[in-house]
Amino acid sequence: MNDLIIQNIKELILPKSTERPLKGKELGELNITENGTVVVKNGKIVYAGEHSDAYEATETIDATDKVVSPALVEAHTHLVHGGSREHEMSLKRQGVSYLEILEQGGGILSTVEATRKATEEALFKKAEKNLLTMMEHGVLAVESKSGYGLDKENELKQLRVSNRLAEKYNLDMKHTFLGPHAVPKDAESNQDFLQEMIDLLPEVKAYADFADIFCETGVFTVEESKKYMEAAKALGFDVKIHADEIDPLGGLELAIDENAISADHLVASSTEGKEKLKNSDTVAVLLPGTTFYLGKESYADARGMLDNDGAIAIATDFNPGSCVTNNLQLVMSIAALKLKLSPNEIWNAVTVNAAKAIDIDAGTINQGDKANIVIWDAPNHEYIPYHYGINHAEKVIKDGKVLIDNRIKLEQ
């Protein structure tokens, strides 16, 4: 006997399962089955496709007039951090740039101070609350970065919290060491601090899957980033890079040359960098919510990347300074409006391609897959990015069991 049947599905979203990320025109190819059925046994997908009455189960969910998709994949977050920075909103309104705020001791450095002061338990409780909000909005696979410690003790503290959250919720979660996220005030020099973070790599290997670095004006150069990435790769890390967020330094080109699993931000990436995506499986993780929150007008050139047969994913960049949202659905709407992505492209970018960007087995509903599914209170897949700012996730199903039922919460 099967455990669960989801029947009468108005639209069943079935992203392609591929070894590599979807690139170029492939991103717009999305299998949508009308009047679909999903069957689950022992936490795994038994069947997903056209309507079928051939199966029996102990529980049946009627998804009439609903959309069913894989659970969303959140490919870029700064989940574990102390404090908040709401006071910076007025500075941004006055036109003060992010780098200027950073130079004044704000930005990342103010979060570093708050994170260092916070106990591990305080960080855990804060991160747990934000993680649960992500899950309520349909996310069941998450990448979580450190980067607000900037020293051994506090970077490890953040990574321990991230690992504890994954264990508590048995969650598909990847952990990223972002030690070189900024240069602390007490550093002798950028180069000395970078070497300190390189020396820390062997110790964080037990807690982190990826090594990441912020390659940007005033932080780390392309040459410094290359040194760090190659040291991390030599220890067995997959590497990522925050690149070309503000200036076109060549971070995207470096990511491709170093075979990084992803390059993130890419607002200012060069034409040459975008052209290099054609022959690379490095995923361009675009963060339009950050551009929106910072009030900037220039967004990452998603269409140009796709025209060059690049692979892109969409994520929130949830953090306390430049994108204070853990609602990936909202960022899907921003991606439609500002990145000019189609609904099909967006769905692939937050499921299968996001999973490739963090090397995790998620984002599809195929026979044998984990039954991590969302039932959406929406008439079709286009409606979710269209009706922005609210939570359309009605039921979040993890390993074949209803983990979150937002409809029950509303009725209560």
UniProtKB/Swiss-Prot annotation:
The EC number(s) this enzyme carries: 3.5.2.7
Annotated binding of N-formimidoyl-L-glutamate, by residue: Y148, N319, G321
Protein name, entry field: Imidazolonepropionase
Family statement: Belongs to the metallo-dependent hydrolases superfamily. HutI family.
HAMAP family: HutI
GO biological process, alphabetically ordered: L-histidine catabolic process to glutamate and formamide; L-histidine catabolic process to glutamate and formate
Annotated S-S bridges: none
UniProt xrefs under SUPFAM superfamilies: Composite domain of metallo-dependent hydrolases, Metallo-dependent hydrolases
One Gene Ontology CC term in the entry: cytoplasm
InterPro entries per UniProt: Amidohydro-rel, HutI, Metal-dep_hydrolase_composite, Metal_Hydrolase
GO molecular function, one term: imidazolonepropionase activity
Root EC class: hydrolase
Organism the protein comes from: Staphylococcus saprophyticus subsp. saprophyticus (strain ATCC 15305 / DSM 20229 / NCIMB 8711 / NCTC 7292 / S-41)
Gene symbol of the encoding locus: hutI
Keywords: Cytoplasm, Histidine metabolism, Hydrolase, Iron, Metal-binding, Zinc
